[in-house]
Amino acid sequence: MSIVCGVPLLECVYCLACARWVWKKCLYTAGHESENWGLATAEEFQPIPHLCRLILAVYEEDLRNPLWAPPGGYGINPDWVILRKNYEETQGRVPPYMIYLDHDNADIVLAVRGLNLAKESDYAVLLDNKLGQTKFDGGYVHNGLLKAAEWLLDAECEVLRELIERNPNYTLTFAGHSLGAGVVTLLAMVAVQNKDKLHDIERKRIRCYATAPARCISLNLAVRYADIINSVVLQDDFLPRTTTALEDVFKSLFCLPCLLCLMCLKDTCTLEEKMLKDPRRLYAPGRLYHIVERKPFRFGRFPPVVRTAVPVDGRFEHIVLSCNVTSDHAIIWIEKESQKAFDLMLEKDRIMEIPAKQRMERLESVAREHTEEYKAALKRAAALDVPQAYSPSAYGTFSEMGKGEGGGENSGRLSEEQVPILSSRRRRESWNELVGRLFHRDDSGQMVLRP
């Protein structure tokens, strides 16, 4: 009898806990996660609207007669498109993509489109992963996205190498949305580890812009590759915040209470310290740009503000209850709001009438600030005892790491036995040793990232 009487009490406690959780989730809207981040400048944010349009262009069948061009067009020259491949040509290994030689911006761009809800092959790539399944460069990555990135590099390395040889001063940029964002994230990391396939291109010439990315790399990799990988998130986008296995999310689409119950239990019972110290947990990659254009308990959209940081803790850890979680994932809205935000930045600079010389000085200052912020993120990761929050080796290949072998005396890569992920000696190393391994002083005495 006492047990029966206790059941309603347990139900009430559970309902109150769920109500509290829902209320907290509602408060996480309007950019709660990034409220303490710094504001992005026009110089660093400039490539993002243009790259969003390049990603949108991949959806077009005929770029000379576009059907879905945004206002002002895609801003590209069809004659500079090197190649395009569709699902039949990629055999479903990766979403359709395009290689574009951007002479206006001295850039070689590989753009990958997002998830196609009508293609089973895209789901196969996205759902091909289990917790702790695949290791890469001292951390963990999404298995399906890594295989797609490896296939893409093998397929196009000859074309990219030729373009890099013919244009030695151009940067190499990987850009993608949603599923494509995860592919280009892993592609950039594989390219850094296999620079010999790309005419030994310098690390500083490789860039990656992942718009609305899935959580695809472990925290140590997300911080260590923040100098080349940038993630763009529009306000309440669900995918960068989805910590539940994606397969479970798709299964729960027809049972929203089941999904909310699962997320409530996980968020309530999992300590943040435990999450940070789990080397298998995946995160949104690199430096984060958060576009915020709505305020809590307000209707309508406000002038967008872009905040940026390389966070360690509080890295989009909480899913948001909002009617915009899916619309904020759309590349069309991301392009529109990023362009609006960039125009506001330019207007502010015009009003301030910043001279050209000061613009150059500010650009150099932004580069220094990013380096300092990158170092601070590494320091924060070391302070929080994040496993492998350092660069174990500047050399090595993906195949060696995939096998978990040292690769011989001259491979330059440490074996799994030599550098265990939970090595207490590595985790207790001093901050000075960490900085010394990742940075060196140039001729002017400035601290710069090692190539």
For each predicted feature, which ranges?
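Non-catalytic, mobile gating and regulatory segments of ester bond hydrolases
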Residues: 1-175, 179-451
